[in-house]
Amino acid sequence: MSYVIDRRLNGKNKSTVNRQRFLRRYRDHIKKAVEEAVSRRSITDMEHGEQISIPGRDIDEPVLHHGRGGKQTIVHPGNKEFTAGERIPRPSGGGGGGSGSGKASNSGEGIDDFVFQITQEEFLDFMFEDLELPNLVKRHITGADTFKTVRAGISSEGNPSRINIVRTLRSAHARRIALSGNSRAKLREAKAELERLKIEEPDNFGDIQKLEAEITRLRMRIERVPYLDTFDLKYNLLVKQPNPSSKAVMFCLMDVSGSMTQATKDIAKRFFILLYLFLKRSYDKIDVVFIRHHTSAKEVDEEEFFYSRETGGTIVSSALKMMQEVMVERYPLNEWNIYAAQASDGDNWNDDSPICRDILIKQIMPFVQYYSYVEITPREHQALWYEYESVREAFPDSFAQQQIVSAADIYPVFRELFQRRLAT
């Protein structure tokens, strides 16, 4: 009997390298399909894969052939239907690779589009590609990055000083049982048969000798299985885990006042869900502070931020004041990178808009890395937008404002706000 031991390090995903090469080759097609999927999906439905279709003409392999120049003499077979100069009509249907419309035809051929599925992980990778938090720097200077050594499981390769004896012997024992199991079963049967013959047929020397020879052969076969094989060796895997010295916090400020229609609130929630998904996926060490406001502001948890029905009037400065207070109390400026994203419909008590501008310019913007403001309205901008333009003029590198008219604008605006900047 033959035994096969799979020693491939990537046995279960043997096509992973080929798949990654394929994704790199057709990156433009996949990115376009992902952007179209984002525009038609609900933001809460982002953590799923997507079916990608690549036209058949784009998957042709390049070939070498003779150029069309020069003089050639070719003899073509004749026919009874056409004469020189006539045009051959295009088939009306059944040509292959079509959309399926039209009548059936008994002629024509083509290539269907190549359709494949990308995973949830790959979908999010393409979705958040080239995005980052702007101006992320090390605020807490402690010299070089520090690392700590942590256990990271068991490896088949390693330093002999880190060999795991228990796991090695367990693996060797399991291998010996697997490779000698059939021989051991036959050995037990032969011993039982030999005992029976010695009791019932003691004069049957021929069969007894055959069984004794078989028992000897089986024992030698079992003994030939090596006690320890290189495949059995297991080592304690130790890795260096960096201690991050860059810490970041994102303040999410959402207007839930009565002027915000349900559709506007839904767009604001979807924008922040997209932002939250981006932060949690891209950054392991980041705090998120949720602040809802109408006439008064309140710091809430994730559940209440996205699903609470509380509403009221509109005083935007209440949220900015609360953000400034939380910054001072919990996030020392010399240690934390501070970011903020604000969503509103632009409506505000008229006397409050200049207050918002002053709070931003004097108490918030000098201490934050980046502040983004999105105004969700199809109407003309109001006083708050124009006051914020003054803030943008004072802090052009760290303040950005964009308008969202419909749900289709959420993803393009999000990419515009958090597009990776080239180093200058």
Curated annotation (Swiss-Prot):
Q: Where is the composition biased (Gly residues)?
A: 92-101
- Pfam families hit by this protein: DUF444 (PF04285)
- Name it: UPF0229 protein Avin_46880
Q: Cystine bridges: which residues?
A: none
Q: Where is this region: Disordered?
A: 57-108
Q: Which family does it belong to?
A: Belongs to the UPF0229 family.
Origin organism is Azotobacter vinelandii (strain DJ / ATCC BAA-1303)
